[in-house]
């Protein structure tokens, strides 16, 4: 009977313990990445001047005839290594099969350019990227969207209109493109989508808005 009771208690409590541990990893590593990358930007500005002058929206590696990325051809990687890498602790860099840059950190997290033809949107992974599929349904679960767009880039196709008002002049920020400034919109844009955004695009911003803690009413099951 005693063993049976222990088994029942374990079956009830273990999933909660696992879920709470996962939440803690997400919260801690999101906050750490946000702090670390923006400190790196501040340090880089001391040497390179205002970030709006050295930011650029650059593409990833070119793909060769053999279908593999051409080593050394990623403009995004060259930019990152010039302006941010010297001020961050990095364990390794990779180029994925589509030419996108992936940066790995000592705590097991990583960040990757979302697109192969631009470097203003980034996906942060609290844990191994290989364990999190590319589907947008994973945004807010194991992948979290950021944008770095302090100014209109020389090589980008963006603007400085009101859609970017929560990014222009700032560092790496949770994705807030087209946000109307309302807290309820962050919730809606995390649960499904808000206006023109992709699904779950605002989950990172929702967590930031709650002091880098996952809200009790977080709309996505982790």
Summary of predicted features, one role per range:
Residues 1, 7, 41, 108-110, ...:
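Contiguous, often N-terminal, cationic amphipathic patches that form binding interfaces
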Residues 1-22:
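N-terminal single-pass transmembrane signal-anchor helix
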Residues 19-34:
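Membrane-proximal amphipathic alpha-helices
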Residues 25, 49-50, 66, 73:
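Extracellular/luminal recognition modules and glycoprotein regions
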Residues 38-57:
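Alpha-helix exit/C-cap motif
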Residues 58-62:
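Short, charge-patterned binding micro-sites
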Residues 67-222:
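Intrinsically disordered, low-complexity regions enriched in Pro/Ser/Thr/Gly and acidic residues
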């Amino acid at each position: 009977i005693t063993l049976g009771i222990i088994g029942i208690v374990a079956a009830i409590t273990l999933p909660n313990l696992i879920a709470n541990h996962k939440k803690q990893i997400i919260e801690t590593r999101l906050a750490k990445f946000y702090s670390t990358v923006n400190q790196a930007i501040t340090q880089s500005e001391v040497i390179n001047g205002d970030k709006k002058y050295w930011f650029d929206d650059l593409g990833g590696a070119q793909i060769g005839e053999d279908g593999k990325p051409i080593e050394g051809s990623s403009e995004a990687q060259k930019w990152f290594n010039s302006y941010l890498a010297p001020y961050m602790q990095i364990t390794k860099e990779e180029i994925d099969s589509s030419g996108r840059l992936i940066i790995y950190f000592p705590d097991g997290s990583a960040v990757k350019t979302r697109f192969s033809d631009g470097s203003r949107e980034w996906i942060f992974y609290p844990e191994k990227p290989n364990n999190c599929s590319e589907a947008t349904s994973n945004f807010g679960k194991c992948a979290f969207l950021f944008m770095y767009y302090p100014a209109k880039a020389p090589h980008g196709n963006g603007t400085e209109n009101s859609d970017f008002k929560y990014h222009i002049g700032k560092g790496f920020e949770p994705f807030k493109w087209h946000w109307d400034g309302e807290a309820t919109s962050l919730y809606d844009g995390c649960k499904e989508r808000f206006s023109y955004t992709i699904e779950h695009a605002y989950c990172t911003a929702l967590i930031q808005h709650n002091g880098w803690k996952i809200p009790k009413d977080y709309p996505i099951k982790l």
